[in-house]
Amino acid sequence: MANTNLKEAKAAKNDEFYTQFHDIEIEMNAYLEYDPDVFRGKTVLLPCDDPEWSNFTRYFAAKFDELGLKKLISTSYAPDAKKMKLLAEPSLFEKEAPQFDPQKAQTKGKIFVLEKDHTGDGHINIDDLEWEYLEGDGDFKSKEVTQLRNEADIIIHYCPKKLPHRFS
């Protein structure tokens, strides 16, 4: 079954294989050892990073208070934009949201923002993550997503190997 999924991803030229949480933590710790305040008061942008699948948003959400982040923004591609043969099933997180729209869930990208304690538990974490649909499909080259970089102090971006280019 897993091999079938990999073959389908290869056929669809989907080379977005996700980084493990532990590996992200090791890399970020290197930055923190060099400068413990490297993220303090900063807005971090993670373009084309779906927190329902990727660990980068999960890492920064889990460490939001500890890192002293001001704001976390991540965007994700629309399933239709990925051109995969596999049917993308919206997550429970998405389906239970009042703004859920089955049509938009397939054709529109999403923006996820974390900056406030919405749950009232005194901490800002993944439970406080808010999202909405983008106007477009979430392509990191789109005007909509590139405008977000003007708000960001730090951009962490994994560009699929098939799409290397300048993020400008």
Question: Can you annotate each of these PLM segments?
Answer:
Residues 27-33, 141, 145, 157:
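Structured alpha-helical segments in the cores of large, soluble enzyme domains
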Residues 38, 148-150:
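A short, aliphatic-rich alpha-helical micro-motif
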Residues 119-147:
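Alpha-helix-centered segments that form part of catalytic cores
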Residues 138, 152-153:
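Helical hinge/lid and interdomain linker segments adjacent to catalytic or ligand-binding clefts
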Residues 155-162:
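Amphipathic alpha-helical repeat scaffolds
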Residues 162-168:
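A short, conserved alpha-helix within the catalytic core of class I
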